[in-house]
Design a protein with these regions (language model features):
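Non-catalytic, conserved peripheral segments adjacent to functional cores
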Residues: 1-98, 112-149
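Glycine-centered loop/turn positions within well-structured domains
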Residues: 107
Length: 149
């Protein structure tokens, strides 16, 4: 029993782009300074996003409630104008599925259930706090206008 131990698990309150609280996240597993798994929670009706990760892919599994995952993938049209293509996926805890989202895909999370929604994410590579510019925030208006940051 000498190997049994408790470790702190950091919990962070999250906010939308206008500063309103929309849920929280908690680090589930860490490898040194890097977070290899975390749970993100969204209040009923709340939206989290949009953002993309330049180097990190996401792997989501919904373990409570129903979550709509809204994705925007960057593409080009003939005149050189950037166009983001929208795609939606629903993850439901009553029918567990994994959703893989590659790097450079803008992602929004919307709780479409009546209870708090929980998503577990296993990012690849693990979240590294030293990569300061790896996450890029977007608004829906910026994505629809073809903005690239």
């Amino acid at each position: 029993m000498n190997n049994v131990r408790k470790e702190p698990a950091k919990r962070v309150t999250t906010f939308d782009h206008s500063g309103r609280e929309n849920g929280w996240l908690v680090e589930l597993y860490k490898d040194g300074a890097k977070t290899t798994a975390y749970l993100t929670a969204a209040a009923a009706g709340a939206f989290k996003g949009y953002h993309l990760h330049r180097v990190r892919a996401a792997r989501y599994v919904c373990v409570r409630g129903r979550m709509r995952i809204i994705l925007y993938t960057m593409g080009m049209v003939e005149n050189g104008q950037t166009v983001w293509t929208r795609q939606e996926h629903v993850l439901d805890a009553s029918n567990p599925e994994r959703l893989f989202i590659p790097a450079d895909v803008a992602t929004g999370l919307e709780n479409i259930g009546a209870e708090e929604g929980w998503l577990i994410n296993y990012p690849e590579p693990a979240y590294d706090p030293d990569l300061k510019d790896e996450q890029v925030e977007y608004t829906q208006a910026e994505l629809e206008a073809g903005t690239v940051k």
